[in-house]
Design a protein with these regions (language model features):
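Periplasmic/cell-envelope proteins involved in peptidoglycan metabolism and beta-lactam response
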Residues: 1-309, 336, 411-419, 531-534, ...
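Beta-lactam-recognizing serine transpeptidase/beta-lactamase-like catalytic domain environment
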Residues: 3-5, 86, 220-234, 279-342, ...
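Soluble non-cytosolic domains of exported or imported proteins
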Residues: 72, 101-108, 140-145, 194-198, ...
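Sec-exported extracytoplasmic/periplasmic mature domains
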Residues: 115-119, 155, 191, 209, ...
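Acidic/histidine-enriched alpha-helical segments
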Residues: 124-134, 267-280, 364-366, 430-434, ...
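Ligand-recognition elements built from short beta-strands and adjacent flexible loops
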Residues: 498, 535, 549, 580-756
């Protein structure tokens, strides 16, 4: 029998056993958790320090550094002679360091000053002053006048509020186009971020844009910027400079006469002019009329604004976008058109190359031709009768060219179409080049071949046509057109040159020389209607295209046309080719000979002398060659009169002075021999004016006589031969001008016929 004490001890052991075991299990569990947790931590730490080490280091750096981009200076765009067409000028960027403000008065003064200078909302600027940062951009690309205001504000904050180091001016750049709208469709423009959006600015953006710099600012543990002394500046690298093949002088001449052509002929859908070096493919000028100001590329014309305003409000945004796209569009590259009769130079070249024709091959035109039951008319509805191959080209006879196309057949026709480069993009270094539209292989029927033979019912780009024209003239070589000649770095070192690239030879040199001869004959025979320029051998072809295509073979056509002229000079040593076309002339005339040829003549009459192309006058032409006025000022009246007469002119003295103070025409002005030089001896005598007479419809001699009777001078262009008749004058009849003023008169050969 147990004692009471033994019972109590047993009871205590019984009570203690479960509790102790529970505590032991709890301790083991805690220990196990600690071991597993520590093991996981070790494994995680090992993973982080090995596998994710680089990633975490980068993340840590990102948390400690604030990285701000600094603009690079965009490269300059130059013309062929080094004239600046686009440049980035120095402007400034206004930035704040808000954490440097010491009190609300400083913040309020800064916010008030900045909001007034830049016309910003005061509360928005005040909110910026409260940011925990050392770098907040207030305004980008400010110019000198605003910079001066900011400098005054900085000075005021320092003097009146003991606030310094808060506002800074950093270097920035703004794009400028010193020639405004010149070559706008070629150069293009940049956006607000200085990225190229159109033209060369877009195509060569990677070269022009440069490499931005950086401002790296250290941050403290709270995530706010540390003082400026903890900054690191990485300098930006300026962009490269791009040199164009475009010649500013030639471009200006082309734009001047093309715009006049648009106005004179009420052209509804713009005009295009391309001037190209036939041997290298360098584009000397490229014009799409109705250009825009590159410094303000979103400003539409009054005509476009009026049209948009008349549109339903729900459609106005869409209409504005379409109007801008049309304004920026480079029609010379991005649009296609039916070339019409200018394409005949390619068809004729192909037939010659295949020995299917020669200059004596005879064709008969009765005024129409039947093809697979369809009657296709000639522009000369009475017919050209019997004509040889050279006359066929000059007569631009559609029935004869249909026969030539049939001689070639659809297969050979396609072969030369491809050979001249029409089936592929030219590869010109401009954005948005369009593709041609032609019959698929095996799908060209007899009627299709017939109308294609005179340039209808298929579409090509203007740049393709001028490239093919160059191949006709240069020995048959298809050269790739280009508008950039070289690229230099910011120090002037050449890093890239664009060399001549010959794709293929499509016709032989012999065929090319024959075509030069035949197309020159066309110009001589047709006179100003086909690009005749006194003193120069010009080869060329007119074109008048029905825009709807030939779908009904009638003698009457639709009212919408494309008027064109494509030619080159000198014919015996081709250097420059030019295409001129106007889309939908809506004036009194629409034929290429009436609308485009005169513009071609006016442009080439200035461009060829500028390029130092030698003249070669006939004896008859020599009688009407302009002479240049000398400088007759600053000497006595007697001395001036002697010099004037020695130069082959007559002198007319105005005023009572003894010394010549001014003259009309001015120095180097071109005028006919025997013309009158007006010498002024005092300012009072310079107010006299005369009314310009009509000089249209006269022979060269008659024009000289009428101008002389009015005390005016004349300068001649075009067909200045005995059969020439004046067709236009640059100053309208009835205009008041000073005595001695030079009137430029253009002549057409009155013996020529209208052949398109």
């Amino acid at each position: 029998m147990q004692s009471p004490g033994s019972k109590n001890n047993s009871k205590k052991r019984a009570e203690k056993g479960p509790a102790q075991r529970l505590r032991q299990r709890t301790a083991i569990l805690i220990l196990l958790i600690l071991v597993l947790g520590f093991g996981a931590a070790v494994l995680r730490l090992t993973y982080l320090t090995t596998v994710q080490s680089s990633e975490l280091q980068e993340s840590a750096v990102d948390l400690q550094l604030a990285d701000t981009t600094v603009s690079a200076k965009r490269g300059t765009i130059y013309d062929a002679n080094g004239n600046v067409l686009a440049e980035s000028a120095s402007v400034w960027q206004v930035v704040m360091s808000p954490v440097n403000f010491k009190n609300d008065k400083q913040r309020q003064a800064a916010a008030k000053g900045l909001s007034e200078i830049f016309d910003l909302e005061y509360n928005d600027v005040l909110d910026d002053t409260k940011q925990q940062s050392h770098y907040v951009v207030v305004k980008r690309r400010i110019e000198s006048d605003e910079r001066e205001k900011v400098l005054k504000l900085i000075d005021t904050l320092k003097k009146d509020y003991s606030c310094s180091g808060v506002i800074q001016l950093l270097d920035d750049y703004k794009r400028y186009y010193p020639k405004n709208s010149l070559a706008s469709s070629v150069i293009g423009f940049t956006g607000s971020d200085d990225q190229g959006l159109e033209g060369i600015e877009y195509e060569y953006d990677s070269y022009l844009s440069g490499t931005p710099g950086r401002i790296i600012t250290a941050q403290n543990a709270r995530g706010t910027d540390m003082p400026f002394r903890y900054e690191q500046n990485v300098e930006s690298e300026d962009g490269n400079n791009v040199y164009l093949t475009i010649d500013e002088t030639i471009q200006s001449i082309c734009e001047k006469y093309m715009q006049k052509g648009v106005e004179d002929n009420n052209v509804l859908n713009k005009g295009v002019c391309i001037a190209m070096d036939v041997n290298t493919g360098a584009i000397l000028a490229m014009v799409t009329t109705d250009g825009y100001d590159l410094n303000n590329p979103y400003e539409l014309s009054a005509k476009d604004k009026k049209k948009i305003k008349s549109t339903a409000k729900s459609k106005q945004a869409e209409a504005e976008s379409a109007a801008l796209s049309n304004m920026w569009r480079n029609k010379a590259v991005a649009d296609t058109y039916m070339p019409g009769s200018v394409f005949k130079m390619c068809v004729a070249s192909a037939a010659l190359e295949e020995n299917l024709v020669n200059e004596k091959t005879s064709f008969t035109c009765t005024g129409s031709i039947s093809v697979e039951g369809e009657t296709i008319h000639c522009s000369n509805i009475s017919g050209h009768g019997t004509q040889n191959f050279v006359e066929v080209i000059s007569n631009s006879c559609n029935p004869a060219f249909i026969q030539i196309g049939q001689m070639l057949g659809a297969g050979k026709f396609r072969q030369y179409y491809q050979g001249f480069g029409f089936s592929d993009k030219t590869g010109i270094d401009l954005p948005g080049e369009a593709e041609d539209s032609f019959w698929k292989e095996g799908k060209m029927g007899g009627v299709d071949l017939a109308v294609a033979s005179f340039g209808q019912n298929f579409s090509i780009t203007p740049i393709q046509m001028i490239t093919a024209c160059a191949a006709v003239s240069n020995g048959g070589y298809v050269v790739q057109p280009h508008v950039v000649s070289k690229i230099t770095d910011s120090k002037g070192n050449v890093i890239k040159t664009v060399d001549k690239k010959v794709k293929r030879q499509v016709i032989s040199d012999d065929t090319s020389k024959k075509m030069n001869e035949y197309l020159e004959y066309n110009t001589e025979r047709q006179g100003a209607a086909a690009g005749y320029i006194s003193g120069y051998k010009v080869a060329g072809k007119t074109g008048t295209t029905e825009k709807r295509g030939v779908t009904k073979f009638e003698s009457s056509f639709s009212e919408d046309y494309i008027s064109s002229f494509c030619g080159y000079a000198p014919a015996d040593d081709p250097q420059i080719a030019m295409l001129v076309f106007f889309d939908t002339p809506d004036g009194d005339a629409y034929y290429g000979s009436q609308v485009s040829s005169p513009v071609f003549i006016n442009i080439m009459s200035e461009v060829l002398p500028y390029l130092d192309v030698k003249t070669s006058y006939t004896d008859e032409e020599l009688g009407y060659v302009d002479a240049s006025a000398g400088d007759y000022t600053g000497v006595s009246v007697d001395e001036a009169k002697t010099a004037v007469e020695a130069d082959g002119f007559t002198a007319t003295v105005k005023g009572n002075g003894s010394t010549v103070i001014s003259q009309i025409p001015t120095v180097s002005s071109g005028l006919q021999k025997g013309g009158s030089i007006v010498l002024y001896t005092d300012s009072n005598s310079q107010s006299e004016t005369v009314s310009v007479p009509s000089l249209i419809g006269l022979s060269p001699d008659e024009v000289n006589d009428v101008a002389s009777a009015y005390g005016l001078n004349v300068s001649f262009s075009g067909a200045t031969t005995s059969s020439g008749t004046s067709s236009s004058q640059n100053i309208e009849a009835g205009t008041s001008v000073s005595p001695g003023t030079v009137i430029t008169v253009s002549f057409a050969d009155s013996s020529s016929t209208l052949n398109e």
